[in-house]
């Protein structure tokens, strides 16, 4: 197994599919990385040379991935909450942010039902 951005990448899968194991790299970004490094998308990771793997690592290094991306997302949410804007308040209360109804639905964001105590 090859390691890219601190993640074990499966050797027996195509390059595009294997790159999606890295948090922050989807199919489109993986295709762009393959095109930039000159590697065919259907090439298996196990057959790549060390120079090609270094090229992929360098290209992935240009993107925000894994821990840095998670930290950036959390900091953006924290910033919204500190500002006290509408989206920040919705985050703070654990409710949907984008205008969905909450009278009957939104169970995913709100969590399980709480019984009414009498």
UniProtKB/Swiss-Prot annotation:
Region (Disordered): 94-118
Keyword field: Ribonucleoprotein, Ribosomal protein, RNA-binding, rRNA-binding, tRNA-binding
Domain of life: Bacteria
Annotated Gene3D superfamilies: 1.10.8.50, 30s ribosomal protein s13, domain 2 (4.10.910.10)
Disulfide bonds: none
Single biological process term from Gene Ontology: translation
One MF term in the entry's GO annotations: rRNA binding
SUPFAM superfamilies, alphabetized: S13-like H2TH domain
GO CC annotation, single: small ribosomal subunit
Assembly mode: Part of the 30S ribosomal subunit. Forms a loose heterodimer with protein S19. Forms two bridges to the 50S subunit in the 70S ribosome.
Family indicated by similarity: Belongs to the universal ribosomal protein uS13 family.
Chain's role: Located at the top of the head of the 30S subunit, it contacts several helices of the 16S rRNA. In the 70S ribosome it contacts the 23S rRNA (bridge B1a) and protein L5 of the 50S subunit (bridge B1b), connecting the 2 subunits; these bridges are implicated in subunit movement. Contacts the tRNAs in the A and P-sites.
Name this polypeptide is given: Small ribosomal subunit protein uS13
Species in which this protein is naturally found: Cellvibrio japonicus (strain Ueda107) (Pseudomonas fluorescens subsp. cellulosa)
Phylogenetic classification of the source organism: Bacteria, Pseudomonadati, Pseudomonadota, Gammaproteobacteria, Cellvibrionales
């Amino acid at each position: 197994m090859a390691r890219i951005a601190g993640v074990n990448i499966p050797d027996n899968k195509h390059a595009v599919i294997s790159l999606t194991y890295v948090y922050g790299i989807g199919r489109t970004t993986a295709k762009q990385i393959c095109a930039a490094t000159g590697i065919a998308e259907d090439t298996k990771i196990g057959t790549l040379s060390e120079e090609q793997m270094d090229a992929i690592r360098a290209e992935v290094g240009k993107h925000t991935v894994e821990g840095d991306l998670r930290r950036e997302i959390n900091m953006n949410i924290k910033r919204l909450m500190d500002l006290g804007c509408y989206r920040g308040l919705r985050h703070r209360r654990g409710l949907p942010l984008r205008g969905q109804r909450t009278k009957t639905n939104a169970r995913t964001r709100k969590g399980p039902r709480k019984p009414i105590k009498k």
